UniProtKB/Swiss-Prot annotation:
Gene3D superfamilies: Metal-dependent hydrolases, Urease, subunit C, domain 1. Its cofactor is a divalent metal cation. Binds 1 divalent metal cation per subunit. It comes from Rattus norvegicus. Keywords: Carbohydrate metabolism, Hydrolase, Metal-binding. Substrate binds at residues 154-155, 235-236, 243, 269-272, 328-330. One of its GO terms (biological process) is N-acetylglucosamine catabolic process. Pathway: Amino-sugar metabolism; N-acetylneuraminate degradation. The keyword Metal-binding applies. This is N-acetylglucosamine-6-phosphate deacetylase.
Amino acid sequence: MRSGQSAALAPVLQFTNCRILRGGTLLREDLWVRGGRILDPEKLFFEERRVADEQRDCGGRILAPGFIDVQINGGFGVDFSRATEDVGSGVALVARRLLSHGVTSFCPTLVTSPPEVYHKVLPQIPVKSGGPHGAGVLGVHLEGPFISREKRGAHPEAYLRSFGANAFHDVLATYGPLDNVCIVTLAPELDRSHEVIQALTAKGIRVSLGHSVADLRAAEVAVQSGATFITHLFNAMLPFHHRDPGIVGLLTSDQLPPGHCIFYGMIADGIHTNPAALRIAHRAHPQGLVLVTDAVPALGLGNGRHTLGQQEVEVDGLIAYIAGTKTLSGSIAPMDVCIRHFLQATGCSVESALEAASLHPAQLLGLEKTKGSLDFGADADFVVLDDTLHVQATYISGELVWQAEEAGL
C-alpha cells in the first residue's frame, strides 16, 4: 500500500494535449499522475504549491481507463485450464501480451474441468498487481462445472456436476479453496443453486448466471439471492421468447432488488452475437453491458488445432469451433478489436464503448473506486488511443508498460 508521505515525494507527471474519459464524457483536460494514482491538480497547486516534474504531449489522443477482461480462457498458446506444474508462467505470458491490447487487468477463466484440475491450478493463480511485467490478475473466473447439460456449449459433458444435499460442500470439494476466485458462473435452475449463490456472495465472490435453461422467474430469484452478472448474454441460454424471455429478460425485469444493477457480458467479436442483438441489449440496458473476449488459447495464433481445457479447438479464420463440430468455442478477438466492433455495430458513443470495457467490469467487481475510471484517487491504469480506437500506449500505475512503435509517447 502506498504511504501518503512516499506518494507526496514521488514525481508528478502531467499528460497534456489529450482528451480524457471522465464521468462519461471525453474532456479536453490534462491528466495528472503521482505515486501510481490519478491526482487532483487543484490540490497540487493550492495546497502543495507544486507543478509537474514532467510533461508528456499526447498529440491530441484519447486517454481512457485501462480495459478489464473478466472472461478470458487463455491466449497466445496458453490454456488456463491445463493443470501443469507451472501455471504461473503461462498466466504471466498472457498478462504481458494483453498489454498491447490495452488490457490492464483480467480474470483468468477456467472452463468445466475435473476437480483435480481446479485443485492444482487455482492455488497457482493468485491475485497480482499489474506493472511492466503485465496486466494485473483480479481473481479467477470459474465457468462451470455447475451448469446445464443442454446448454453446455463447449464444456465437456463428462465433468458437469450438480449440487447435492450439502451444496456448498460440493462446491468446495470440486474447486478446493476459493481464496483466488472472484467470479463463479452457474446455472440457476439447478437444485440448491440459491443456497450456493448466497454462500458465494457472502464470501465476496460474484455469481454469474450462464450455460442455463432457466426461465425468467428462476433467474430473478437467483438475482434476489445475490447473483449480479450474466455470462455471455444470448450465448448458451434459452433464446428470448415473448411469453418467457428467460435470462435475457433480466435486462428489463422489474423484480430485481431496488437499486440493483444487473451486469451482463457480451462477446462483440462479430461471430458470437449478431449486430442487431448487440443493439437490442445495449439499448435495453446500456449501463450493465460488460464487454468480454471469452478468448481461447488460440488468441494470437493462426489456423489449426489448439486446446481448451479437456477438449480440442479448431480455428478457421476468425472462428473457433470444438474440433470436428460447428459448436463455437470461445473467441479469438482481443479486447480492442471487440470495442471497435461494438462501436461500429451499435452506433453508440465512443465513451459508451470504452466504459463497457473499463468502468462497467470494475463496477461488477466492486472495484470502481480504484479501477475503471480516471477519477481523482483512482489507480493510474490507462490506455492511449487514436481516433479509430487503436491502442497507442498502455500505462499501469502511471508507468508506461507498452507502446506502439509509431506512438512516440
